[in-house]
């Protein structure tokens, strides 16, 4: 979130497109201490937006999360790009705020942007604090599997390479100022 470093990077390289994936993402950490989430997810995004505007990039793609929409349980209607935001924790609130900054730069300064809200990624080298690695490691170690709440929350899972393909398609063919909901229709409750 250091604007000087961001500016220098834009200055030294001929950057024409930004795909913004940088974020603090672990919900539990955001509940314990939200400061890093404010710095990285909100101020970090703001600094990238300022540099993107200054250096007149051709496209700014912001990768966000479906967590900004709240949560789903069995029988609930699926999220869509028109679903109102309903963040339920400091992490999702910080991502919702960064989404709003991107949209504000688009409408105020005409920054060419696209935005995607993606479901839960899984795949190689996933951080050990994420849900699937925690469950797998708990099983391997003979530990109790942690379940949040009653385990009824629904998560859609997407393989990381499929998410990357979606980002590329949005970056190259997406319509400016549009939001794209990225998922795989692989919905499971935490208990499943």
Describe each PLM feature range.
Residues 1, 32, 40-43, 82, ...:
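Residue-level signal for the nucleotide or nucleotide-sugar donor/cofactor binding architecture
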Residues 21, 101, 134, 166-169:
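Generic recognition of well-ordered alpha-helical segments
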Residues 1-121:
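N-terminal Rossmann-like NAD(P)+-binding domain of SDR-like oxidoreductases, especially those catalyzing
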Residues 52, 106, 139, 170-171:
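Hydrophobic pocket-lining residues that define ligand/cofactor binding sites across diverse proteins
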Residues 38-41, 91, 136, 183, ...:
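Amphipathic, non-transmembrane alpha-helical scaffold segments
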Residues 96, 114, 121-134, 141-143, ...:
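Glycine/proline-rich active-site loop of Rossmann-fold NAD(P)-dependent oxidoreductases
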Residues 5, 47-51, 157, 162-165, ...:
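Conserved mid-core alpha-helix of short-chain dehydrogenase/reductase
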